Amino acid sequence: MDYTNVYGVLHKTNFIIIMILIDGKKIAAELREELKKEVLNLKSKHNKIPGLTVILIGDMVPSQIYVRMKEKAANEVGLKSEVIRYPDSVEEKTVLDKIDELNKDESVSGILVQLPLPKHIDKQKVIEAISPGKDVDGFHPVNVGNLSSGYESTVPCTPLGCYLLIKKFEKNLSGKKAIIVGRSNLNGKP
């Protein structure tokens, strides 16, 4: 197969691929600035600052890095941010009780339980314990069902991020086709 690169366009018999270099860091910085303004607006109009609480169980380095990045981004845009850390040995009931407490706490706008969880903790039970309105990941069955049915819902971060990136370059997505590789609950469904 012989492809020719001409001004960012690859030509091959019967199809054309257009390539666009996307500066994700720049777009993320722009989005953070927009969010910062929204947070300030909420504070001035309603005297309320949204709050994100993340539950991190165990000491897996990738999870710690990911949570640290979330905490940094939340602080950058002016959100209240809290990370609750538990050891791998934490009992499931302790986690469920904490989620129940956070669901009732009006200063907490969003709850995120960092996955994966230790084997002795039922992931589905933990996900279902989070109030659908505070489910940051969009994993609660109510949110998954609403999203699958085309109703307003929390959208998982990765697909939403991809959508926002695409919208920066292509304003009208009507009639467009997309390929999603993978079928995980986080990225590939629904």
Predicted region positions:
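Positively charged, low-complexity intrinsically disordered leader regions
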Residues: 19-46
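Short hydrophobic alpha-helical segments enriched in small aliphatic residues
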Residues: 4-12
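Short beta-strand elements in bilobed, periplasmic/extracellular small-molecule ligand-binding domains
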Residues: 52, 74-89
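Short beta-strand segments enriched in small/hydrophobic residues
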Residues: 49-59
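Glycine-rich phosphate/diphosphate-binding loop of Rossmann-like nucleotide-binding domains
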Residues: 57-71, 153-190
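Anion-binding alpha/beta catalytic cores of soluble intermediary-metabolism enzymes, centered on
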Residues: 113-178
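Non-catalytic terminal and connector segments of soluble metabolic enzymes
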Residues: 76-78, 101-103, 130-133
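Short, well-structured alpha-helical segments in soluble
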Residues: 94-106
